Regions:
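N-terminal, polar/charged subdomain of small-to-medium soluble alpha/beta proteins
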Residues: 2-241
Length: 241
């Protein structure tokens, strides 16, 4: 089996620019014995699954005949295979990475009659964050060159912060909603979102603007495989380096 090449999500998406058609199912509700809860415990928890498969060629015949044929993937079967793979996983606990790969394998098997260009699986835990909307992992894989992407994220974490350098701005903390992505994530760090949220909260309590800007970097760096650039022009998001 060819060695997987880990890429930044934005770079991986550039490689998929020539993909013509995609089939996606979003927010499939399951209870998964995967990841960790807000207390860091390995217990079953609700999860929302989003699976997207990319085709190297347009499904013209299916569109012209208004029928699901061998040129495309039936989204109903794609949904059922993703949910079934989680239900059949058994009582053994899975890391978020293992769960994402399990679902990716099920999606690939469901589309066995179609040549897939890529598959992306997003595992989102609505109860995976104490102060935010949740946490999750996005796992992307291209089958042609075996390139992959792993992104750990926190969504809408609400923290009070001292913002600004003027004296009147430092009299009271202001509510801030922060979302955080960690790209090029190491495989064994896909369940560290609780630790990352704790780091984010700790930094937000600092009264120093420079600390708020830079203190997270040395904490998050060990979670990744290699450094990142500051700015992703494709996604228009800041990334820690």
């Amino acid at each position: 089996m060819a060695e997987e090449k880990l890429l930044r999500q934005a770079v991986w998406q550039c490689y998929q620019a020539e993909v013509t058609d995609q089939i996606s199912v979003s927010n499939l509700q399951v209870t998964a014995n995967a990841g960790v809860d807000v207390w860091g415990r390995k217990k079953p928890q609700p999860a929302l699954l989003t699976v997207t498969v990319s085709l190297p060629q347009p499904f013209s015949s299916a569109a012209e005949g208004d029928v699901v044929d061998s040129s495309t993937v039936h989204y109903g079967r794609l949904s059922k295979s993703a949910i079934s793979s989680v239900e059949k996983a058994g009582p053994s606990w899975l890391s978020s990475m293992d769960l994402a790969q399990l679902i990716e394998g099920a999606a690939s098997a469901t589309a066995s009659s179609v040549s897939l260009a890529a598959c992306e699986v997003d595992v989102f835990y609505p109860k995976g964050s104490m102060l935010g909307d949740g946490a999750g992992l996005t796992y992307s894989k291209a089958y042609g060159d075996n390139t992959i992407s792993r992104v750990l994220y926190l969504k809408n974490v609400r923290v009070p912060c001292i913002i600004g350098v003027n004296s009147h701005e430092r009299l009271m903390k202001q509510p801030v909603v922060a979302s955080l992505w960690i790209d090029c994530l190491a495989r064994d760090q896909t369940d560290e979102y609780i630790k990352v949220e704790q780091m984010l909260i700790k930094v937000s309590h600092s009264d120093s603007k420079p600390l708020q800007q830079y203190k997270l970097r040395p904490c998050i760096r060990p979670l990744r495989n290699h450094p990142l650039r500051h700015w992703s022009p494709l996604q228009r998001q800041w990334w820690l380096d």
